Amino acid sequence: MPTIKQLIRNTRQPIRNVTKSPALRGCPQRRGTCTRVYTITPKKPNSALRKVARVRLTSGFEITAYIPGIGHNSQEHSVVLVRGGRVKDLPGVRYHIVRGTLDAVGVKDRQQGRSYGVKKPK
């Protein structure tokens, strides 16, 4: 415990909260351009080829974003919308690409779980 004299000399520093998605700069989503689309393998007990894209955002950051869903049309120079949200088994991937907006089309033949940019079936 500090003494009163020590507290007068220099006050307590407030705990600063660190953002988990700094590249978004406090915005809910950001637009960006794909610079490279490729696959990477997940951490240990999992095994797959996860689709990711290197994206240059309008905020100036270059980030790695996950492409969710089965099949995608993203390629180099595609304009995509990026949201926060990490992928637990991919180290360094802290963003998701939003399907169904800009150049990223929704997942084909999707009926349920339509958070993949799919219109509601009539």
From Swiss-Prot:
GO cellular component: chloroplast; small ribosomal subunit
GO biological process, one term: translation
Subcellular location: Plastid, Chloroplast
Swiss-Prot/TrEMBL keywords: Chloroplast, Plastid, Ribonucleoprotein, Ribosomal protein, RNA-binding, rRNA-binding
Entry keyword annotation includes rRNA-binding: yes
Signal sequence range: none
A Pfam family recorded for this sequence: Ribosom_S12_S23
Principal localisation: plastid
Keyword ATP-binding: no
GO molecular function: rRNA binding; structural constituent of ribosome
Subunit comment: Part of the 30S ribosomal subunit.
HAMAP family: Ribosomal_uS12_B
Family under the similarity heading: Belongs to the universal ribosomal protein uS12 family.
PANTHER family: 30S RIBOSOMAL PROTEIN S12 FAMILY MEMBER
Function, as annotated: With S4 and S5 plays an important role in translational accuracy. Located at the interface of the 30S and 50S subunits.
Name this protein carries in UniProt: Small ribosomal subunit protein uS12c
Organism of this sequence: Chloranthus spicatus (Chulantree)
Lineage: Eukaryota, Viridiplantae, Streptophyta, Embryophyta, Tracheophyta
